[in-house]
C-alpha cells in the first residue's frame, strides 16, 4: 500500500458498522506503564516543565453494561472538579481512556472540555488534533498505541 488512506479502506481494516472500521477500536497488546510521582521541587531537577497533578478522580464500573463507562467518566470528572474547582474549560489538553475513536470526543463533552453535542464538529474540523485549539489524546490514545490491559 502506498498511503495510510489506502490502508484505511483496505481488507486489513474491515468495516465494522456504517461508519466504523477495525482500526477505530482499541487493539489488545502486551505492555506496561509507569509514572513517577514526586514533589514539584524535585521534578525541577529533571525537567524545566514538570507536569503538576492538581487532582485525581477515579470510578469503577461493572463491565457487563457498556453504558456504565459513561457514568464512570462523569463520576471521576465530578471528583476532580470538586477537588480543584476547575472545569473542562480550564484544561489545555484532554486524554480520554478510549475504547473506540468516538469515545474521545464523547468523554470530552461529558467533562465540559468540548461543548455538548459539538464534539463531532470539532473532530471534523481537526480542532482536536495535536495542533488544534482543543487537543485530545495527542499520544494517539489506546486505539493507536494499543491496550495492554491494566496498564492504561
Language model region names:
Residues 41-44, 82-85, 109-113:
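Generic secondary-structure signature for well-ordered alpha-helical cores
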Residues 53-54, 93-97:
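Short, conserved beta-strand edge motifs with alternating hydrophobic and charged residues
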Residues 1-20:
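Glycine-rich, mobile lid/loop segments that gate access to catalytic sites or pores
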Residues 14-79, 125-139, 143-144:
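Condensing-enzyme catalytic core mediating Claisen C-C bond formation in acyl metabolism
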Residues 1, 19, 76-92, 103:
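Conserved active-site "lid/cap" helical segment
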Residues 65-69, 98-121, 150:
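Short glycine/threonine-rich loop-to-helix capping motif typified by GTGT followed
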Residues 85-94, 137-146:
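Hydrophobic alpha-helical bundle architecture
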Residues 59-60, 73, 87, 98-102:
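Short, catalytically relevant binding-site loops at active-site mouths
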Amino acid at each position: 500500500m502506498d498511503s495510510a488512506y489506502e490502508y484505511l479502506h483496505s481488507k486489513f481494516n474491515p468495516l465494522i458498522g456504517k461508519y466504523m472500521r477495525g482500526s477505530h477500536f482499541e487493539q489488545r497488546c502486551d505492555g506496561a506503564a509507569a509514572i513517577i510521582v514526586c514533589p514539584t521541587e524535585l521534578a525541577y531537577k529533571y525537567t524545566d516543565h514538570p507536569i503538576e497533578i492538581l487532582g485525581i478522580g477515579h470510578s469503577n464500573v461493572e463491565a457487563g453494561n457498556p453504558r456504565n463507562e459513561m457514568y464512570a467518566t462523569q463520576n471521576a470528572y465530578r471528583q476532580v472538579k470538586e477537588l480543584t474547582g476547575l472545569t473542562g474549560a480550564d484544561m489545555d489538553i484532554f486524554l480520554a481512556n478510549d475504547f473506540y475513536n468516538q469515545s474521545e470526543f464523547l468523554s470530552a463533552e461529558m467533562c465540559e472540555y468540548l461543548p455538548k453535542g459539538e464534539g463531532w464538529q470539532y473532530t471534523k474540523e481537526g480542532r482536536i488534533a495535536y495542533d488544534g485549539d482543543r487537543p485530545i489524546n495527542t499520544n494517539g490514545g489506546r486505539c493507536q498505541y494499543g491496550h495492554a490491559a491494566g496498564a492504561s
